[in-house]
Swiss-Prot record:
Zn(2+) 2 binds at residues 814, 888, 895, 898. It comes from Buchnera aphidicola subsp. Schizaphis graminum (strain Sg). InterPro entries: DNA-dir_RpoC_beta_prime, DNA-dir_RpoC_beta_prime_bact, RNA_pol_asu, RNA_pol_N, RNA_pol_Rpb1_1, RNA_pol_Rpb1_3, RNA_pol_Rpb1_3_sf, RNA_pol_Rpb1_4. The RNAP catalytic core consists of 2 alpha, 1 beta, 1 beta' and 1 omega subunit. When a sigma factor is associated with the core the holoenzyme is formed, which can initiate transcription. Zn(2+) 1 binds at residues 70, 72, 85, 88. It catalyses: RNA(n) + a ribonucleoside 5'-triphosphate = RNA(n+1) + diphosphate. GO terms for cellular component: DNA-directed RNA polymerase complex. One of its GO terms (biological process) is DNA-templated transcription. One of its GO terms (molecular function) is DNA-directed RNA polymerase activity. This is DNA-directed RNA polymerase subunit beta'.
């Protein structure tokens, strides 16, 4: 028995491992893998189909072709297992060893491995410090390289051409040794003393100052260090033995007709073997050098093609003119091993069919066609039939099922009971694309789907198909039921709002039911409850919409979960009273006592979930759906052509617009307006006309006049079907109705510009040919956009998932006090997003105090739920510091407190939740809804761009942030500092509005003053930037010489003369160094100092500045000295939509980016060069000044002598996130990216929670650059994983050594994915070759921390239910390591399961043998 056990143990390999290491293979290593040398290029004998001996498919090397049978047939059967046949030399074993046994080829001449040679940066080139060109010339036998110099003046590694070599031979004879080919490179690599070389380089690094040289040296040091640490030898990058892939991985299959289908690898191997054998023969014959050399070069090329075809020179093609697939091609790309087979496995058995509506289903059910269920649950049915004794064998059971006997259907019913199935609709963009349902057997062939889950699947019933999968194991069924059941996924993981929301018919039905009507039948009745209301409606005593009084009993939920009833008579309508019947206990009547639109219904479900929990909500949702369908049918809403009422005023409006356009045309012809102005004005006129028509139409549609009980005329909301559909949010929008009954309006040309003649007709009137033609542009552009968009959006999602896949919640609390300060998002006078929406579901980072007191309102580490948020609003708190993933201190993963609420469940997030993937899906899934367009600023947008004043909307107090100001001669306040923020604050100290106030704005009211709504508080000229004096005195011109630095111009209309400063480019040579400026002096001509500084008041004027003062004029503070015209930005494209999101996550530097101040200090300008000016910032504390060259054409926001803070904007433009991170820190960059991304999604009306974007930002910030390494193991300037630096510094601090200093880096998502610690994950993402080359040289170890690596190696992922499994595994390992079992008795210790499994395997195989006999 013991022997049997030992034997079985040997059969099953140990598969338990914790990490995967990749490194270079030494020749001995390759030989140790190999089971024999492949000597012949033959594959199989085409007559007998038996593999040739010593060939590429040789059975002696790779194992038998048939299970337990040698090639010549002497030994067959299991009893001979392990015997090696003396005749044919084949070991008798399973044939699957042909998938794992490797062979090798002994190369007659060493060959360079192309990956280490040509994959940039070339590793061989870096190690030898030789240019790649030279190495290639040596390898491909074009030049010699000196290896031993001897007593000559040649240098080691010097390249010699044929002539130079011959000359040197004549001169020095045998003194030196030079050669060519891979042998030369190999001996050079062998000669490198890694440790010594490394030391020399470090010394050199400390002595050099040139930046480029330092970079090169660090690269070499890093490479050498990685060789030393990984125990790789450089000469292993040159192959002397070539491994041969197991034959079953490069199959050769006979087709009928005597032909063979073969893997390309066989061709490539054959080439190598042929050339290698020929080379061997030539060497034995001592052939002439030139022939041998040519053969060696050909061998090198053959091996290059085998490893990576097409990397160097032209790819080798097969018989069909296609390049052959090499080993590298096998693993990379979408069709490669990683993405096709390891990450993208197909499901073994599933069904698929068209979907139809199942309006009678419950939320957790789906209709499954009987035929399909029978097929999917076959094995279960067979099992049941056998257990019941209804069938004796599986074969008999199979027959019964095939005949579809009556008993089979009963069994099927039993099997299916409470066995969930998974439904999946492609494309699965987020986790709600696969949900579990309990199947209900139905006739027919289509799957029936519950209408409420359509939103999650993004499904409709116009021919969509869905796939059905059966979870087999008990665990799988449990997970399907507990985690994936549709009833457990009521909230969307992206924003925490219900995703099970009624749409279309249901919304229309509920809307119709809850509408009110004046003077309806039965108005004014008093009813004793909902039942009576339904009764009078059914008996047609009253209409659905009549206003009545009803006795309603509401139930309020108590703290102890009991309900307190409260009855009162409420004014409502019949329909609302009927609807109240389905509302669960615990909700107030007020939620149905209103006209319910789509938003209100969603809110109603949300309230229900928050107050009553999951079960009542699910039941309520179902009831809502049934009721909605029923009453939509009763409403009889339909669309007829008469419902599209065209307003009477339309003709008039259009006529007026045409007259205005004609006027402008006349002005243009008489030369009063330019062509551009005319075009813009015409478009404005038509846009306004369209608005007027639309308004008239909506007024017309949305109201009707009726007589009330007293016979007076009254207006009420209309019951027009089209209006009801749009108003309820069931289908359609005001914009679509406008096209049906208003006018279609302006159309765009394919290039995006607007055609100035609008389509005045609407769809009811019909379009003429020209109008129809114009409108085809837009439609086609839309279709083309959609196709592009889908692909781009999918790629964005893939990159996001890849960068965030390893982020999992791993601990409860990391204990950090850091956080993000959340304030309401206010733009101008509108609150874009109130504070409660931003902090809901977050954890507080510090105590929140009641304003103006020391009392604690909310403790630190409180999860803010709806009740807490109400409390915040009650105490009018307008900023809260909450914890954020970006600040989380957890080394690997995130802690639950920093993440906060699990949006799809409504409680604190669980350990093991894969928040990275959820974040990626939440951002990627709405990607297809974003536009692809880049907008031209046109029409409405440009009006917003040229604001020239601030008008207040709410009453309040003015609060100016970082403002400096002076009072001018007329007593008004003039702002003299930049990025001033004006906030309007109400009595509760809450910010209501925020505005940006530009430099030079004139304020009507000052800081702390009270303003009323509608007041204008600031004015400025939008087209020029003024230069404002801060002191009073007399103007003195400096360096302002007419014709050299300035020119005088007279205005034609006013006759006033003004001085214009010339740009340096426009000046003559004499004027180049002049720096025109205005100095302010007192009566005696002494400099006036700016108050509070030692600086004289001197204002330097930039080019193009206009001065309207004369020399020696008296001025007072706050007056304008000069004006700099703003070049109107013209139509700058703002990138919008999807491309903008991609740019943000890729952290791309924008074109013409804003220039920020690197340090705080005083601005001055130094010597100018041809196209640039020198900006100098001198710190106040006297440390070193900072200089920067700035192109002349940039408009600067600062003047000489102005004080700036680090991170202030010096020249406007889009800001680069890298600059923000460097100068303002992690918080600022997080805020910037979150706001910018949200801006894009908000425009499309998509809600995504901020924390998803923060999760991605955390991943973008996971690298840092070491500045000073201190006592750590890092190099200066090396880029390291941030968590590694943190861990290392923690250890160094404990030992009181010097920790490393570092700066955080922001990487784009593609870069960040490729820079992960896990090489398996990076290789499966992009640039597989480069990643694997780098990792092999460095001998990297993959700890298998992320999800992707574990999927690839075929394990449970360390998230979700797999999280517990991995923890358990680690604990088990830990206990095994601590109490090592004594070795002597461990051999016989084998678990019962293992023994039984092994035995059954053995018995099965013997049984099979008997069957055959």
């Amino acid at each position: 028995m013991k022997d049997l056990l030992k034997f079985l143990k040997a059969q099953t390999k140990n598969e338990d491992f914790d990490a995967i290491k990749i490194s270079l293979a030494s020749p001995d290593m390759i030989r140790s893998w190999s089971f024999g040398e492949v000597k012949k290029p033959e594959t199989i004998n085409y007559r007998t189909f038996k593999p040739e001996r010593d060939g590429l498919f040789c059975a002696r090397i790779f194992g038998p072709v048939k299970d337990y049978e040698c090639l010549c047939g002497k030994y067959k059967r299991l009893k001979h297992r392990g015997v090696i046949c003396e005749k044919c030399g084949v070991e008798v074993t399973q044939s699957k060893v042909r998938r794992e046994r490797m062979g090798h080829i002994e190369l007659s001449s060493p060959t360079a491995h192309i990956w280490f040679l040509k994959s940039l940066p070339s590793r061989i080139g870096l190690l030898l410090d030789m240019p790649l060109r030279d190495i290639e010339r040596v390898l491909y036998f074009e030049s010699y390289v000196v290896i031993e110099t001897g007593m000559t003046n040649l240098e080691k590694r010097q390249i010699l051409t044929e002539e130079q070599y011959l000359d040197a031979l004549e001169e020095f004879g045998d003194e030196f040794y030079a050669t060519m080919g891979a042998e030369a490179i190999q001996s050079l690599l062998k000669d490198i003393n890694l440790v010594k070389e490394c030391e020399n380089l470090r010394i050199e690094l400390n002595e050099t100052n040139s930046e480029t040289k330092r970079k090169k040296l660090t690269k070499r040091i890093k490479l050498l260090e990685s060789f030393i640490q990984s125990n790789n030898k450089p000469e292993w990058m040159i192959l002397t033995v070539l491994p041969v892939l197991p034959p079953d991985l490069r199959p050769l299959v006979p087709l009928d007709g005597g032909r063979f289908a073969t893997s390309d690898l066989n061709d490539l191997y054959r080439r190598v073997i042929n050339r290698n054998n020929r080379l061997k023969r030539l060497l034995d014959l001592a052939a002439p050098d030139i022939i041998v050399r040519n053969e060696k070069r050909m061998l090198q090329e053959a091996i290059d093609a085998l490893l990576d075809n097409g990397r160097r020179g032209r790819a080798i093609t097969g018989s069909n003119k296609r390049p052959l697939k090499s080993l590298a091609d096998m693993i990379k790309g979408k069709q490669g091993r990683f993405r096709q087979n390891l990450l993208g496995k197909r499901v073994d058995y599933s069904g698929r069919s068209v979907i139809t509506v199942g309006p009678y289903l419950r939320l957790h059910q789906c209709g499954l066609p009987k035929k399909m269920a029978l097929e999917l649950f076959k094995p279960f049915i067979y099992g049941k039939l056998e257990v019941r004794g209804l069938a004796t064998t599986i074969k008999a059971a199979k027959k019964m099922v095939e005949r579809e006997e009556a008993i089979v259907w009963d069994i099927l019913d039993e099997v299916i009971r409470e066995h969930p199935v998974l439904l999946n609709r492609a494309p699965t963009l987020h986790r709600l694309g696969i949900q579990a349902f309990e199947p209900v057997l139905i006739e027919g062939k289509a799957i029936q789907l519950h209408p409420l889950v359509c939103a999650a699947y993004n499904a409709d019933f116009d021919g969509d198909q869905m796939a059905v999968h059966v979870p087999l194991t008990l665990e799988a069924q449990l997970e399907a039921r507990a985690l994936m059941m549709s009833t457990n996924n009521i909230l969307s993981p992206a924003n925490g709002e219900p995703i099970i929301v009624p749409s279309q018919d249901v919304v229309l039905g509920l809307y119709y039911m809850t509408r009110e009507k004046i003077n309806g039948k039965g108005e004014g009745m008093i009813l004793n409850g909902s039942n009576e209301a339904e009764k009078v409606y059914r008996l047609e005593i009253a209409e659905l919409h009549s206003l009545v009084k009803v006795r309603i009993t509401e139930y309020k939920k108590n703290k102890d979960q009991s309900f307190i009833p409260k009855t009162k008579i409420i004014n409502t309508t019949i329909g609302r009273a009927i609807l109240w019947m389905i509302v669960p206990k615990g909700l107030p009547f007020s939620i149905v006592n209103q006209t319910l639109g789509k938003k209100d219904i969603s809110k109603m479900l949300n309230t229900c979930y928050r107050i009553l929990g999951l079960k009542p909500t699910v039941a309520f949702a179902d009831q809502i759906m049934y009721t909605g369908f029923a009453y939509a049918a009763r409403s009889g809403a339909s669309v007829g052509i008469d419902d599209m009422v065209i307003p009477v005023k339309k003709l008039n409006i259009i006529h007026e617009a045409e007259i205005e356009v004609a006027e402008i045309q006349e002005q243009f012809q008489s030369g009063l307006v330019t062509a551009g102005e005319r075009y813009n004005k015409v478009i404005d006129i038509w846009a306004a006309a369209n608005e007027r028509v639309a308004k008239a139409m909506m007024e017309n549609l949305s109201t009707e006049s009726v007589f009330n009980k007293k016979g007076e005329k009254q207006k009420q909301i209309s019951f027009n079907s089209i209006f009801m559909m749009a108003d309820s949010g069931a289908r359609g929008s005001a914009a679509q109705i406008r096209q049906l009954a208003g006018m279609r309006g302006l159309m765009a040309k394919p290039d995006g510009s607007i055609i100035e003649t609008p389509i005045t007709a609407n769809f009811r009137e019909g379009l003429n040919v020209l109008q129809y033609f114009i409108s085809t542009h837009g439609a086609r552009k839309g279709l083309a956009d959609t196709a592009l968009k889908t692909a781009n959006s999918g790629y964005l999602t893939r990159r996001l998932v890849d960068v965030a896949q390893d982020l999992v919640v791993t601990q409860n609390d990391c204990g950090t006090h850091e956080g993000i300060l959340m304030t309401p998002l206010i733009e101008g006078g509108d609150v874009k997003e109130p504070l409660r929406e931003r902090v809901l579901g977050r954890v507080t980072a510090e105590k929140i105090l009641i304003p103006n007191t020391e009392n604690i309102l909310i403790e630190r580490n409180t999860l803010l739920n709806e009740q807490w948020c109400d409390l915040l609003e009650k105490n009018s708190i307008d900023n809260v510091k909450v914890r954020s993933v970006v600040n989380c201190e957890t080394d690997f993963g995130v802690c639950a407190y920093c993440y906060g609420r699990d949006l799809a469940r409504g409680n604190l997030v669980n350990k093991g939740e894969a928040i990275g993937v959820i974040a990626a899906q939440s951002i990627g899934e709405p990607g297809t809804q974003l536009t692809m367009r880049t907008f031209h600023i046109g029409g409405a947008a440009s009006r917003a761009a040229t604001e020239s004043s601030i008008q207040i909307k709410n009453k309040g107090i003015i609060n100016l942030n970082n403002a400096k100001s002076v009072t001018n001669s007329s007593g008004k306040i003039v702002i003299t500092s930049r990025n001033v923020e004006l906030n309007i604050i109400d009595n509760f100290r809450r910010t209501k509005e925020t505005y940006k106030v530009p430099y030079g704005a004139i304020m009507a009211k000052g800081h702390g003053e009270q303003v009323n709504s509608g007041e204008t508080v600031a004015k400025w000229d939008p087209h020029t930037i003024p230069v404002i004096t801060e002191v009073s005195g007399f103007v003195r011109f400096v360096d302002m010489i007419d014709g050299q630095s300035i020119t005088r111009q007279a205005d034609e209309l006013t006759g006033l003369s003004s001085i214009v400063v010339l740009d340096t480019a426009e000046r003559m040579t004499i004027g180049k160094d002049l720096r025109p400026s205005l100095k302010i002096v007192d009566r005696d001509g002494n400099d006036v100092l700016i108050s509070g500084t030692e600086m004289p008041a001197q204002y330097f004027l930039p080019g193009k500045a206009i001065v309207q003062l004369d020399d020696r004029v008296q001025i007072s503070s706050g007056d304008t000295l000069a004006r700099v015209p703003q070049e109107s930005g013209g139509t700058k494209d703002i990138t919008g939509g999807l491309p903008r999101v991609a740019d943000l996550f890729e952290a791309r530097r924008p074109k013409e980016l804003a220039i920020l101040a690197e340090i705080s200090g005083i601005i001055s300008f130094g010597k100018e060069t041809k196209g640039k000016r020198r900006l100098i910032i001198t710190p106040v504390d006297g440390s070193d000044a900072y200089e920067e060259m700035i192109p002349k054409w940039r408009q600067l926001n600062v003047f000489e002598g102005e004080r700036v803070e680090r991170g202030d904007v010096i020249s406007d433009g889009p800001e680069s996130p890298h600059d923000i991170l460097r100068l303002r820190g992690v918080q600022a960059v997080t805020k910037y990216i979150v706001n910018e991304v949200q801006e894009v999604y908000r425009l499309q009306g998509v809600k995504i929670n901020d924390k998803h974007i923060e999760v991605i930002i955390r991943q973008m910030l996971r690298k840092a650059t070491v500045i000073k390494s201190g006592n750590s193991e890092f190099l200066d300037g090396e880029q390291v994983e941030f968590s590694r630096i943190k861990i290392s510094n923690r250890i160094l601090n404990k030992q009181s050594k010097i920790p490393a200093t570092f700066s955080r880096d922001l990487l784009g998502i593609t870069k960040a994915s490729l820079a992960t610690e896990s090489f398996i994950s990076a290789a499966s993402f992009q640039e597989t070759t480069r990643v694997l080359t780098e990792s092999a040289v460095a001998g990297k170890k993959d700890e298998l921390r992320g999800l992707k690596e574990n999927v690839i190696v075929g394990r449970l992922i360390p998230a979700g239910t797999g999280y517990a499994y991995h923890k358990e595994r680690l604990n088990r390992r830990h206990t095994v390591n601590t109490n090592q079992i004594k070795p002597n008795n461990s051999s016989s210790q084998i678990s019962a399961e293992e023994a039984s499994a092994s035995l059954s395997e053995l018995l099965n195989s013997t049984l099979i043998q008997h069957d055959h006999t």
